C-alpha cells in the first residue's frame, strides 16, 4: 500500500465505522398517531427557507481569490501530509520488521 491509500484508509475507516454503528437510546413507547401533515409542511417550509438563506449568503460572500487560495493551500497541505505519512509508514514498518 502506498502512503495515499493508507491515509485514505486512516481517514475513511472511522467515518465508515461511525456511519455503520447504530445509535441506540432508551426504548420509548412508539406513538400510534401519525405525524400531522401540517407539521410536516411547516417543517418543510422552514427547511426550504433556511436552504435559500444559506445559498444566498454563500453567493454574496463568494470570493474567487479566496477560493483559489484555499484550493492552493489544500493541495500543498495534502502533498505534505502524503509525504510525511509515507515517512511515518516506512518508520513503522522498519520498527515492526526489526533488525535482520
From Swiss-Prot:
Region (Lipid binding): 65-73
Leader peptide range in chain numbering: 1-25
Record has Lipid metabolism as a keyword: yes
Residue ranges of the TM segments: none
Tissue: Liver.
Top-level taxon: Eukaryota
The UniProt record lists the keyword Transmembrane helix: no
Protein name per Swiss-Prot or TrEMBL: Apolipoprotein C-II
Gene assigned in the entry: APOC2
Amino acid at each position: 500500500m502506498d502512503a495515499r491509500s493508507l491515509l485514505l484508509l486512516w481517514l475513511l475507516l472511522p467515518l465508515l465505522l461511525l456511519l455503520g454503528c447504530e445509535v441506540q437510546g432508551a426504548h420509548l413507547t412508539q406513538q400510534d398517531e401519525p405525524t400531522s401533515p401540517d407539521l410536516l409542511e411547516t417543517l418543510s417550509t422552514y427547511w426550504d427557507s433556511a436552504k435559500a438563506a444559506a445559498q444566498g449568503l454563500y453567493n454574496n460572500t463568494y470570493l474567487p481569490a479566496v477560493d483559489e487560495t484555499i484550493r492552493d493551500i489544500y493541495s500543498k497541505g495534502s502533498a505534505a501530509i502524503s509525504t510525511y505519512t509515507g515517512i511515518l509508514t516506512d518508520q513503522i514498518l522498519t520498527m515492526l520488521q526489526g533488525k535482520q
